[in-house]
């Protein structure tokens, strides 16, 4: 995992969509997986996976929000840590020392990596292919993690490959009422936030501030067109492998 010291940043983009209203927030220190969770890692913890595009080194996909959360809990237990999630209520205990999904603010903070531009490498998408697997270069499928350049903080595939589930419920107007310190999304909602774009995304949908949402589909298996969704884990600061 990569340690991110936390800090203040401007979340959103004045040139983006209406739900990207710029506002300054701060996040506490946390650790984030350097790579998206791979099929091999997922199988090691869960025992099997339902990815469409079989490749042990590629990110696990066809994964629901609930399945990602259950993986976080199982990974925590496997390492002797306290699970963050109550799978009856789907509430996250942010004080627990186990693995969880990043908040939307944590995800954007990590993706920006100290930058203020549309992407961590600048405002132009001309260099996106050096950092991401997207519609133009993926060959129509997700690719092995870590094969493109990392962002300035050493995180790989923050753009493209698989779109990443975040912990937050989605609300188009949330930025207008979001707290300035450690925002964790609305208390309820029908969809969860997904960030970063995927192997099937246009460049504009991979921007650091771009927001997307999806029905969390509370089931272990996603049947259909969910081979663009995956995830990576975070832990609140206090020690991580």
What are these regions (language model features)?
Residues 172-178:
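A short, polar/charged loop-to-alpha-helix boundary motif
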Residues 14, 37, 48-49, 76, ...:
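Acidic glycine-/aspartate-rich tracts in secreted/extracellular proteins
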Residues 1-51, 56-76, 159-160, 167:
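A short glycine-rich, aromatic-capped structural motif
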Residues 9, 55-129, 165:
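Short, well-ordered surface patches within globular domains
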Residues 89-94, 100, 132-159, 186-188, ...:
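Short, well-ordered junction/capping motifs at the entry into regular secondary structure
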Residues 149-151, 184-241:
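Disulfide-stabilized, aromatic/cysteine-rich ligand-recognition loop
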Residues 2-3, 31-36, 61-62, 100-102, ...:
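Structural recognition of the beta-strand scaffold that forms the well-ordered cores
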């Amino acid at each position: 995992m990569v340690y991110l010291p936390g800090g203040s940043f401007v979340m959103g983009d004045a040139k983006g969509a209406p739900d990207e209203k710029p506002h300054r927030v701060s996040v506490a220190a946390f650790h984030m997986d350097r790579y998206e969770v791979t099929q091999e890692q997922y199988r090691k913890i869960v025992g099997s996976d339902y990815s469409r595009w079989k490749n042990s080194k590629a990110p696990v996909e066809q994964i629901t929000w609930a399945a990602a959360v259950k993986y976080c809990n199982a990974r925590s237990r496997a390492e002797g840590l306290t699970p963050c999630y109550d799978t009856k209520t789907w509430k996250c205990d942010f004080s627990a020392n186990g693995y969880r999904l990043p908040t939307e603010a944590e995800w954007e903070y990590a993706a920006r990596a100290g930058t203020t531009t549309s992407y961590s490498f600048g405002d132009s998408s001309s260099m996106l292919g050096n950092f991401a697997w997207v519609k133009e270069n993926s060959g129509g499928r997700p690719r092995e993690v870590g094969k493109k350049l990392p962002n300035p903080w050493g995180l790989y595939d923050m753009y493209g490959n698989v779109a990443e589930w975040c912990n937050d419920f989605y609300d188009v107007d949330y930025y207008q009422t979001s707290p300035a310190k450690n925002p964790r999304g609305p208390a309820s909602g029908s969809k969860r936030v997904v960030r970063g774009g995927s192997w099937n995304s246009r460049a504009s949908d991979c921007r650091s501030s771009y927001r997307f949402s999806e029905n969390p589909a509370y089931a272990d298996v996603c049947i259909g067109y969910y081979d663009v969704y995956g995830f990576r884990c975070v832990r609140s600061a206090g020690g991580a492998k």
